[in-house]
Amino acid sequence: MSQLYASLFYQNEVTEIFSDRALVSYMIEAEVALAQAQAQVGVIPESAAIAISNIAATAIDQIDFDVLAVATGLAGNIAIPFVKQLTAIVKQSDEDAARYVHWGATSQDILDTACILQCRAAMTHVEALIQQCYRTALTQAEQYRSQVMIGRDRKSVV
């Protein structure tokens, strides 16, 4: 985030949605959804999906973001080192379930899904801001509908 423009262009709620922690949370959410969907159709054992879901609920607090940042630079994307950390976290509690973390998915699948989840969450805030702008503009247009005024920009009359 640009500190120079922070007070002009950023909304704290939206900025938080695009934080590193939020991205990893959405990646965890994608991995959980993948495991649950695969269990529903018999691709992985239901017990593995349940274990992955339960363990993932607190996994964000166990992710080492410093290690993840360095490994992301070495790997070329966040997904590969993320999956290694998530798998290790699941393995601490359920070695069998750890085998099914990220089963059949590509790194890009998880990263793309997480990014779309971020965008969806941000759009909730953006839509509310657009509605607020619309209501304000409508109020101003109604209030000053009969007011004659010249057009202008910051420095000159148009």
Name these PLM-found stretches:
Residues M1-S156:
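A helix-coil-helix interface module used to build multimeric assemblies
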